[in-house]
UniProtKB/Swiss-Prot annotation:
Belongs to the iodothyronine deiodinase family. Predominantly monomer. Can form homodimers but homodimerization is not essential for enzyme activity. The active site is at U126. This is Type I iodothyronine deiodinase. GO terms for biological process: hormone biosynthetic process; thyroid hormone catabolic process. Keywords: Cell membrane, Endoplasmic reticulum, Membrane, Oxidoreductase, Selenocysteine, Thyroid hormones biosynthesis, Transmembrane, Transmembrane helix. Liver specific. Residues 1-12 are extracellular. Its main location: membrane. It comes from Suncus murinus. The gene is DIO1.
């Protein structure tokens, strides 16, 4: 059950005030004392992986922080996380998705017996998602014999008409399902090694899994085996590697009937 209407509204208001204060203070510092806030932003970029991404310089992304577009996106992510009800060990939400062919499906359709299913939520405009995509592909290569993988393309993290970075992939907000499918097809050029589906335009999967801007999950037999933290700070394919490796060891040690 979700929060009662009034309780949720109060929590949303609290988040609104907190984010607004953060943006206001950050904007003042960035405008009046840019050299003072630079070390803080650079430290943050180390955690998100932006500092290691050769595609971007500090000037490509730092000036966009604390902008109006930044405010609305951060607020949306925080509001989404308020309603996050997924927990490790709980039943995994069986949300609707769409194949690149346009065929409708549900996440549980991709689960096979007791094989783990790795869910990779993200979008091409999310720098850390693309930067770490090769890590995800290595997961597919290393564990495809024992696990299944699915990339779920969600709404853009840094759309060109939203909170946009310079030198980023130029993709607008998806106005309809066809635009979302078109954006998701760009991932095929990177040879993902697994099926790619898109979230519905109601963003149902993203909401149920609190996946914005990117997130990793491992499901098994209908339950959440691993729940990664929200990206970009906590998007760690290496954690999924450790989970799958442990499963392989446990399976090898299990007595055979």
């Amino acid at each position: 059950m979700g929060l009662p209407g009034l309780g949720l509204l109060l929590k949303r208001f609290g988040v609104l005030v907190r984010v607004a204060l953060k943006v206001a203070v950050g904007k003042v510092l960035l405008t009046l004392w840019p050299s003072a806030i630079r070390p803080h932003l650079l430290a943050m970029s180390e955690k998100t992986g932006m500092a290691k991404n050769p595609r971007f310089t500090y000037e490509d992304w730092a000036p966009t922080f604390f902008s109006t577009q930044y405010f609305w996106f951060v607020l949306k992510v925080n509001w989404q996380q308020l309603e996050d009800r997924t927990k490790q060990g709980d039943i995994a939400p069986d949300s609707p998705v769409v194949h690149l062919s346009g065929q409708r499906a549900r996440l549980w359709d991709f689960m096979q017996g007791n094989r783990p299913l790795v869910l990779n939520f993200g979008s091409c405009s999310u720098p850390s998602f693309l930067f770490k995509f090769d890590q995800f592909k290595r997961l597919v290569e290393d564990f495809s014999s024992v696990a299944d993988f699915l990339t779920v393309y969600i709404e853009e993290a840094h759309a060109s008409d939203g909170w946009a970075f310079k030198n980023n992939v130029d993709i607008r907000r998806h106005r309809d399902l066809q635009e979302r499918l078109q954006a998701a097809r760009l991932l095929l050029d990177r040879n993902p090694g697994c099926p790619v589906v898109v979230d519905t335009m109601e963003n149902r999967s993203s909401q149920l899994y609190a996946a914005l801007p990117e997130r990793l999950y491992v499901l098994q037999e209908g339950r959440i085996l691993y729940k990664g933290g929200p990206g970009p700070w906590n998007y760690h394919p290496e954690e999924v590697h450790a989970v799958l490796e442990q499963l392989c060891r446990s399976s090898a040690q299990s007595p055979r009937l």
